[in-house]
Amino acid sequence: MKILIALALYSLALLACSEPVGEVDTVFKLIGPDHKIVVDAHDDPRVAGVTCYVSRAKTGGIKGALGLAEDKSEASIACRQIGPITFAKPLPVQEEVFSERISLIFKKIRIVRMVDKARNTLVYLTYSDRVIEGSPQNSVTAVPVDRGTPIPLSGK
């Protein structure tokens, strides 16, 4: 039982937190906050030196203020090398590095890292999904890693 709890806590630690970068208003709302586009930074928790920037719509108004609104599924991602890229441990070929709820219960936005071993490149995909059905809307970006630093892969 203790092992399961430790694994669950470790898994939560791997899902990085987002840091707000900025926002712009898109629609004025007389009551409650305006509709916005928000930009958040997400540091990859297992790849030092890579940060992903995600922009997405955030619903305002009364429902938005109360946390009852469902944000749109569209998002855009741009990941960049912000320092020397290092790996503490081998990476799986594909791994979710971040997820955040964007509606009260049903919808999440996700960032998944994939390793393109042939090109020594990290590929990041963002999309949203629901409990039953996701959205085909997505955005992808890639961060090439210097050939002198091969990406270590785990057996997963």
Place the predicted regions along the sequence by residue.
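Positively charged n-region of N-terminal signal peptides that target proteins for export
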Residues: 1-4
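C-terminal motif of bacterial Sec signal peptides marking the signal peptidase cleavage site
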Residues: 15-16
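N-terminal export/targeting and maturation segments
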Residues: 19-61
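Local beta-strand/beta-hairpin segments that build beta-sheet-rich folds
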Residues: 20-29, 59, 76, 82, ...
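Broad, structure-driven detector of short, well-ordered beta-strand segments within folded domains
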Residues: 37-41, 50-52, 111-113, 121-126
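Mature extracytoplasmic domains of secretory-pathway proteins
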Residues: 51-117
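C-terminal partner/receptor-binding element of secreted or periplasmic proteins
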Residues: 119-156
